[in-house]
Structures are given as C-alpha cells and as structure tokens.
Amino acid sequence: MTTADGPHRADGWAAAVRERLGLGRLLPLGGPEDGSWITERAAAGVLREAASGSGASVEKLRIDSADASRAPEPVVPGPPGALPPGRLRIEADFSATVRRPLPATADALRAALLSAAAQRLGLLVEEVDLRVTDLLEEEPPPEAGAEAKVRTAEPEDLAGTAAAGVPGVISLTRALGGPVQAGVGHLQVELATSGDHRALDVARAVRAAVAGAVEDRPTVAVLVTAVTERN
C-alpha cells in the first residue's frame, strides 16, 4: 500500500463501517422457516410513519430480541450478525400532548406499532415498552417515516433477475456487499421492497423465485434493506 493509497483506503473502510452500523440490527422477518431478515433502520422507518397518527411523537425507537435464548435456529444461514428468528421487543421513547390522557396516547401508540409491525412488515413482536420523555402543549405534527437510503444494484445473474422480477421488489441493493452473495449451496439476496407490499410476503416470494430459477435449487436467504415508495 502506497502512502497515497493509505488515506483513501482508510476513508473507504471507515465509510463501510459507518454504513453497516447505520443499518442497525438485522431483524428476523416471520419465523425460522421464512429465511428472511430486515434491517432495523428500514423497519424503524415504517414504524415511525405508522406511529404518526397516534398523537405521539416517537423520539427514539429500538427493536431487539425479546429473549434470544428461546429463539429457534433458522432453516437457512442468515446474514452475518443477524438476530435469530424469534419474538421481538420494541422500545420507544415518545412525547405526547397534555390535551389527551397519557394512557390513551400510549395505548394508541402501542396499537399502531404492533399493527404496522405485523401487517406492513411481518415482524413477530411480543412486547412494546414505552417511555414518555416530554409533555407538549400542542398535538405533535404528523411525522413521515424517513426512507432508508441504500445503494441500488442491477441484476447480474439469474438469481438477481428472478428476485428483481418479483412483485413488490423496488430494486436490488448492496448494503452488505453484492446484491446476490453466493456460498456453498446457498444464496443471500439483498433488496428494497415497496411500501404497499408486506415485506415478509415479498421476501417469501423472492426466496421461491430465486430457488426455482437457479440450477441445483440452492437455499436462499433474503435481507430487506429498505421499504420505500415507487417513484
């Protein structure tokens, strides 16, 4: 490595580390048989958007395993560092208006988070822990969920082409490497899904499409890195 190359390589390494940390935890979608995961950042964007109609303003949001010791093994290898399939816990700090009873706001927020987690994403949430951090005089304005920014990728092989053609797939992505990463008898596919499709349903369809398109029918894992709207 030359002196000139050193700073550029260091900057590239630092950027890659920041990008990986920005994804948050890799959360299981569905159960152990589903072979699918979603980044915490992508899931949090959907949950924040859903919470905006509850009368609460979510300040911090964290999603983790409810009890990793009880989590079963997945049927396929997951992405490096991914949480095992199992029930999840959502922790949220929020502010609320004094013009509405706090228990009612908390109940509405909890219901919104649980509904979005199940119906829009496919997360199995066991509990929601809420903590109020501030009381406001006025109702907080609706908050649009921030869409995760990810690097998109074009299909480069049969697996990528099959995945990209599944309804609900916006694009392939390369947050952890290439859009399709191959191991021995196993493929991992990264992608962004459309907000009008349930993320787990899209991931299941991608797994089936890729396994059927590739010779020898490898096992397939899917990582959803963004949930976004079509342009």
Where are these regions (language model features)?
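Terminal low-complexity, intrinsically disordered regions
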Residues: 1-131, 136-143, 148-231
